Amino acid sequence: VPVPRLIPIAHEADYRTDRIGHYDDGLFLASAWDHHAYVHLFDRDGAYRRSTITRVADRAALAEALDGLLAGLSGMSYGDIAIQLFQTHQDDVTFGLIDESGDRAGDGSHVDWVELYPDRLGFHEPWDGLYDT
């Protein structure tokens, strides 16, 4: 099954996709990685709008920085989302949901695969919102 137009991402409380859901203007996906706290915003149909990415010097400040980014989203609630592919860059880091379909094993077989960066979460058939790391 080819990569769908909208990639489902399941909300998992207290785990790697615990900061995703809906807000008054659409959908959001937020996380922290290395020295970056970020929130990606999408319209209600899952189309990418923009990202806010904050670099913190002290990794101990990541949770506070992420909470600050989410505080600006009115009507926020956590839950499953479905979004389109997107890509952006900041501080020489790629952020996005990127189609990496192809011969991933090097054996000539084709795999439909989408990777969330920089988190390195892989989505694939049956496209149910669950991921591999």
Residue locations for each model-derived region?
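Sequence signature of WD/YWTD-type beta-propeller architectures
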Residues: 1-133
